[in-house]
Amino acid sequence: MEVFGDNKMFYMRDTWREGTMICDVLPINPSSNGVWPQQKFSDPNINVHFWNYAFPHLQMIFLIISFLWQFLHFFLRRLGMIRFTSHMLTGVLLSKSFLKENSAARRFFSTEDYKEIVFSLTAACSYMMFWFLMGVKMDTGLIRTTGRKAITIGLSSVLLSTLVCSVIFFGNLRDVGTKNSDHTLNSLEYVVIYSIQCLSSFPVVGNLLFELRLQNSELGRLAISSAVISDFSTSILASVLIFMKELKDEQTRLGSVFIGDVIAGNRPLMRAGIVVLFVCIAIYVFRPLMFYIIKQTPSGRPVKAIYLSTIIVMVSGSAILANWCKQSIFMGPFILGLAVPHGPPLGSAIIQKYESAIFGTFLPFFIASSSTEIDISALFGWEGLNGIILIMVTSFVVKFIFTTVPALFYGMPMEDCFALSLIMSFKGIFELGAYALAYQRGSVRPETFTVACLYITLNSAIIPPILRYLYDPSRMYAGYEKRNMQHLKPNSELRILSCIYRTDDISPMINLLEAICPSRESPVATYVLHLMELVGQANPIFISHKLQTRRTEETSYSNNVLVSFEKFRKDFYGSVFVSTYTALSMPDTMHGDICMLALNNTTSLILLPFHQTWSADGSALISNNNMIRNLNKSVLDVAPCSVGVFVYRSSSGRKNISSGRKTINGTVPNLSSYNICMIFLGGKDDREAVTLATRMARDPRINITIVRLITTDEKARENTVWDKMLDDELLRDVKSNTLVDIFYSEKAIEDAAETSSLLRSMVSDFDMFIVGRGNGRTSVFTEGLEEWSEFKELGIIGDLLTSQDFNCQASVLVIQQQQLMI
């Protein structure tokens, strides 16, 4: 039946597909003429509304899916679940299980008409771009630097697990049923299930660690390295198996395989050769082309849009080529993604341009559209259900064991081994895509696909909350020994971790390190860590410039830091030892890099720049970086040693401790003294601050004044008897120390108002203040002031000194003594 419109431009026709009438519109017009329906035919029942067109329909589905998964995630994240679980549940809600056949909602989300082409193409492009972006984020250098532990765990968790499952499968095949019928699983389905169950994909593991904020932890780095090894080994194995299967089918078709048929018939050997040629082109042509684009991009300028568009066209072509070569559609884009240099400027430009749209909109659409074939009602009475559950549980247990055993062999704690096994057993978008591809090609039946999707949903819902409970990243930063300045042996080496966030932090940090008075008798070993935000790659990078473990182009990230601290080392040759590092990671996990480096090098002090910077005269606020503030607070919470937060103010009227001299032994007769005041209220943080001030007093050009606040309040004294005894003992040693010249005074204070007045009267007399943080410690000197504090990380006294009301132009160093110990 054909119905022509008045303009003769299109018609509607009825076609039959398996007994179902499908109305099609020719020629296909993907976009409508507007929201309001227009009368085109005499019969109003055949009018075409705007939602009957492909693109408006697709946009409405995007909107519904985005709303649903974000609504679900709003509640599920409070249970410790990640976004992928919300994506899967959205797909389940829109599947056959909940949308009944022939209902209006089912017809709206159905693709059984001309819109199927648009929907399928959109889902395929989403999956293709996801793998390309994961390739861009992935650091291929991680493979070269992977240790034996990660290689052993990666190979064992995948290859050995698959081998053992194969033995179990063939050995117990008769017990679980092997007849090829509509009611039981066939052998191909078993192979597909346990093969996918034994995999560990880098994108899946990386996304899980990112959402749990574990990628910077020791466990996270090990899991990422193991997943990379697993990915590459399984990719090579899968390519070989696909090639062998194609070759076997070709041999069956021809009776033999020879060169003539290969060349003339476009068969498996030719496809394999094209795949190898494509990899070589990606390495030796595409990657140099990417470096050419980087070279053509001026420093600080964005990458030209034409370059990015050309890359995306090449990615689409690689997906088509991979599909033609009988490989997975993501193989080509993933290889091209690996060939793109990660990080700025090109890698980060690609990520910034496409990541939000792909991960926020298109990827949920792919997951939801892949899950629409889930039909829970088909499982009732299905005889193969027990068999598929058995093989899934068996595969999980085998993989869990073969991940745990190698980890135990390398001496990892039992809890960490279990956590690592759960991470490697996590299932995500890769497994969903693999099952969807198998279902599309007829390798698994609808019931098997339904169970597999439900298992992935259950797996993603259970494992993340267990990991949050089982593994605490802060626990690994706790030490067995006291790592602070107060308990260091006299004249022993002081190890300091100096953090650099901005180039403006370099000079103040060097100035502070000089004030600590390094000498040959009591040297200072400083570990300089330049922290940069991770953009354009998935796995964090940690560069040791001393070992030169990274490529030369990556060391340019920290060139200013390297040059400045190398000069500092030469100026204090024999008294200062410098090791410089660069860490590229997400802001939420940067504290892991800081704490791990401090733990590995047994430092006694971590120096952190304050998140605010001021003008040259110290009066005007220039920048206020909340990301740095959150990072500092995270370090204060989990640091394995003492921590100092340095609030630097450079005033033209103030003196610079390093001005006029190049070495610690050199003296300048006309050099003005540098006045430092230590405000002592009592407690372990203040005792740590006194220890640092005493060390600074060894420099004859630094005048140290210790002002102790005392009170006659008996109640306050009774509540801190033990602390007061330790305070008195330390201060007695300081006053009796004849090697340093320290001015000591005591001020009687009755309440917080007098404390504030005293500090206000002192701010113009000193160049720097040193105070203890005193976190959680109540004192009559500060009672009532805490509720007015703006920066809790500075403590009450430190916050007062940095507040605008005080008009203090002196620098402030806030000290917190080591808190975490096992």
Swiss-Prot record:
<feature type="transmembrane region" description="Helical">
    <location>
        <begin position="388"/>
        <end position="408"/>
    </location>
</feature>
<dbReference type="Pfam" id="PF00999">
    <property type="entry name" value="Na_H_Exchanger"/>
</dbReference>
<keyword id="KW-0050">Antiport</keyword>
<feature type="transmembrane region" description="Helical">
    <location>
        <begin position="190"/>
        <end position="210"/>
    </location>
</feature>
<comment type="similarity">
    <text>Belongs to the monovalent cation:proton antiporter 2 (CPA2) transporter (TC 2.A.37) family. CHX (TC 2.A.37.4) subfamily.</text>
</comment>
<dbReference type="InterPro" id="IPR006153">
    <property type="entry name" value="Cation/H_exchanger_TM"/>
</dbReference>
<feature type="transmembrane region" description="Helical">
    <location>
        <begin position="305"/>
        <end position="325"/>
    </location>
</feature>
<comment type="function">
    <text>May operate as a cation/H(+) antiporter.</text>
</comment>
<feature type="transmembrane region" description="Helical">
    <location>
        <begin position="331"/>
        <end position="351"/>
    </location>
</feature>
<feature type="transmembrane region" description="Helical">
    <location>
        <begin position="447"/>
        <end position="467"/>
    </location>
</feature>
<feature type="transmembrane region" description="Helical">
    <location>
        <begin position="418"/>
        <end position="438"/>
    </location>
</feature>
<dbReference type="GO" id="GO:0006813">
    <property type="term" value="P:potassium ion transport"/>
</dbReference>
<feature type="transmembrane region" description="Helical">
    <location>
        <begin position="55"/>
        <end position="75"/>
    </location>
</feature>
<feature type="transmembrane region" description="Helical">
    <location>
        <begin position="116"/>
        <end position="136"/>
    </location>
</feature>
<dbReference type="Pfam" id="PF23259">
    <property type="entry name" value="CHX17_C"/>
</dbReference>
<keyword id="KW-0630">Potassium</keyword>
<dbReference type="Pfam" id="PF23256">
    <property type="entry name" value="CHX17_2nd"/>
</dbReference>
<keyword id="KW-0812">Transmembrane</keyword>
<dbReference type="GO" id="GO:1902600">
    <property type="term" value="P:proton transmembrane transport"/>
</dbReference>
<dbReference type="InterPro" id="IPR050794">
    <property type="entry name" value="CPA2_transporter"/>
</dbReference>
<dbReference type="GO" id="GO:0015297">
    <property type="term" value="F:antiporter activity"/>
</dbReference>
<dbReference type="GO" id="GO:0016020">
    <property type="term" value="C:membrane"/>
</dbReference>
<feature type="transmembrane region" description="Helical">
    <location>
        <begin position="362"/>
        <end position="382"/>
    </location>
</feature>
<keyword id="KW-1133">Transmembrane helix</keyword>
<feature type="transmembrane region" description="Helical">
    <location>
        <begin position="274"/>
        <end position="294"/>
    </location>
</feature>
<protein>
    <recommendedName>
        <fullName>Cation/H(+) antiporter 3</fullName>
    </recommendedName>
</protein>
<keyword id="KW-0406">Ion transport</keyword>
<keyword id="KW-0633">Potassium transport</keyword>
<keyword id="KW-0813">Transport</keyword>
<keyword id="KW-0472">Membrane</keyword>
<feature type="transmembrane region" description="Helical">
    <location>
        <begin position="150"/>
        <end position="170"/>
    </location>
</feature>
<feature type="transmembrane region" description="Helical">
    <location>
        <begin position="224"/>
        <end position="244"/>
    </location>
</feature>
<dbReference type="InterPro" id="IPR038770">
    <property type="entry name" value="Na+/solute_symporter_sf"/>
</dbReference>
